[in-house]
């Protein structure tokens, strides 16, 4: 892993720790019910849980134009659930240290009270949305924190879980039933 990726992870671990300490000072925080709630579920069922939690049903999406509103909507809904979301294209605010999209697209830092999703904003908006949905799948699955897509997986990449997260993200983005109902080959 590059120094830029490691520094980005460390910075966000500090942010997450600060937020966890803040929540503890406010009172005894309850574990967020969605964290780990999809473990053992098939991708379609998990996608339904995420879609409902993020209020991202197909019927609601027509209001979300242009595409940047989709990203904003998903981020806001995840934060309303109690999670943290960071979209950034550089290490901290250092414009001389741009993040390499080929190295990673996003990562999740798991926490029962403050899960954090980081998305590499050097990707297209559509790519960022898919990466966000993929990282949401990690949060709903629970388990270890980790880096998604790119080169060195920091020795924490389970390809079966990564495939499952991709399937969940794809199902949230384009539900199979909606695709079947609206696809007309003639």
Regions found by a protein language model. Name each.
Residues 1-186:
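Short juxta-domain linker segments that transition from a proline/glycine-rich
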């Amino acid at each position: 892993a590059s120094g830029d990726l490691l520094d980005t992870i460390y910075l966000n671990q500090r942010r997450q720790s600060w937020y966890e300490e803040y929540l503890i000072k406010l009172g005894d925080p309850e574990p967020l019910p969605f964290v780990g709630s999809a473990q053992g579920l098939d991708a379609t069922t998990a996608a339904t849980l995420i879609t409902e939690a993020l209020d991202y049903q197909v019927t609601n999406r027509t209001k979300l134009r242009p595409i940047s509103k989709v990203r904003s909507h998903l981020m806001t809904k995840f934060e309303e659930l109690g999670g943290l979301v960071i979209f950034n294209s550089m290490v901290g605010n250092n414009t001389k240290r741009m993040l390499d999209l080929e190295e990673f697209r996003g990562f999740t830092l798991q926490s029962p009270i403050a899960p954090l999703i980081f998305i590499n904003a050097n990707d297209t908006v559509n790519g960022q949305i898919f990466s966000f949905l993929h990282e949401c799948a990690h949060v709903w699955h629970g388990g270890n924190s980790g880096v998604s897509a790119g080169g060195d997986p920091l020795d924490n990449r389970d390809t079966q879980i990564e495939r499952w997260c991709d399937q969940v993200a794809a199902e949230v983005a384009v539900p199979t039933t909606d695709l079947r109902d609206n696809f007309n080959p003639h």
